[in-house]
Amino acid sequence: MTTFAANIELLYTEHEKFEDRIAAAATDGFKFVEMWMSSLQDVHSLAAAAKANGIQFSSVLAEPRFSFTMPGVDLNVFFDGLKSSIENAKILGSPRLVLGSGMGFPGKKRPAQLDTLAEVFTDAAKIAEEAGIELVLEPVNTRHDHPGALLDRTE
């Protein structure tokens, strides 16, 4: 059976508070919601709203959004953010975090960039696994709304 999650960043925007968006999703029959930026929200309040409405978080975006292959990038910023995202996911009861690839760097060949990404994501997966959180990758549509993103296909 197919299961859908309402993205409360994009849906129910007539409600300013995300707690109200969770309630609206439940009213419409959703059992799951997802969101992007948990760091911008009171995750304890969202967790309480989800519980009160019989809703589960299916996923949350790993923060910060990051471009891993740019020259001089400080990967510690990503790993610190990942650890905070893991804590937020646990509070929300989300079993997974979504990793984006960030922007590609035009001055570096794609295979080398993918190698860098594989190394970073391997380290990230170890951290997440120790915390009991699953990481999933999201290839995005570079032709429509994510031009320049490194991961734009599933192969």
Q: Which positions does each model-derived feature cover?
A:
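N-terminal pre-domain/capping segments
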Residues: 1-91, 122
